[in-house]
Amino acid sequence: MNLNLRVLTPNRVVWDSPVNEIILSTNSGKIGILPNHASLVTAVDIAVMQIRINSQWSTIVLMGGFAKIDNNELLLLVYDAEKGVDIDPQEAQETFNKAKTNLNKAEGKRQKIEADLAVKKARTRLEAINVLTPTSISN
């Protein structure tokens, strides 16, 4: 038995096909989702979602949003999403480095919050392609 996963952004459908297992980061922690999971509505964090199809794992970077699980259907409505295989490692590393530089230069509360968010998004993209592990990245 499978789960039907749909990942939607305001502009496109990122994923719409059956999967065997999902590891999803919510605002209250990571959850594993298998077929026949209890119904649930939750906020989704900026994080990497892991997807298993048979024995193969894939990743999708989620930039926050909401998830609804019901009757083996998982619907994710997210602000933005990107498949891990579509991320250019060199560009992702450059974006992360630039975001960290901007965070160090940030002045004022608003600039620091925006810069910190940019670092989190860039770090998440790197994690999706395994360039860096979560424990090897520091702010």
Swiss-Prot record:
The UniProt record lists the keyword Phosphoprotein: no
Subunit structure: F-type ATPases have 2 components, CF(1) - the catalytic core - and CF(0) - the membrane proton channel. CF(1) has five subunits: alpha(3), beta(3), gamma(1), delta(1), epsilon(1). CF(0) has three main subunits: a, b and c.
Function statement: Produces ATP from ADP in the presence of a proton gradient across the membrane.
Keywords: ATP synthesis, CF(1), Chloroplast, Hydrogen ion transport, Ion transport, Membrane, Plastid, Thylakoid, Transport
GO molecular function: ATP binding; proton-transporting ATP synthase activity, rotational mechanism
Compartment(s) of residence: Plastid, Chloroplast thylakoid membrane
Pfam families xrefs: ATP-synt_DE, ATP-synt_DE_N
Entry-linked InterPro entries: ATP_synth_F1_dsu/esu, ATP_synth_F1_dsu/esu_N, ATP_synth_F1_esu_C, ATPsynth_dsu/esu_N
Record membrane topology: Peripheral membrane protein
SUPFAM superfamilies: Epsilon subunit of F1F0-ATP synthase N-terminal domain (SSF51344)
Protein's recorded name: ATP synthase epsilon chain, chloroplastic
Species whose genome carries this gene: Welwitschia mirabilis (Tree tumbo)
Family of the protein in this entry: Belongs to the ATPase epsilon chain family.
GO CC annotation terms, alphabetical: chloroplast thylakoid membrane; proton-transporting ATP synthase complex
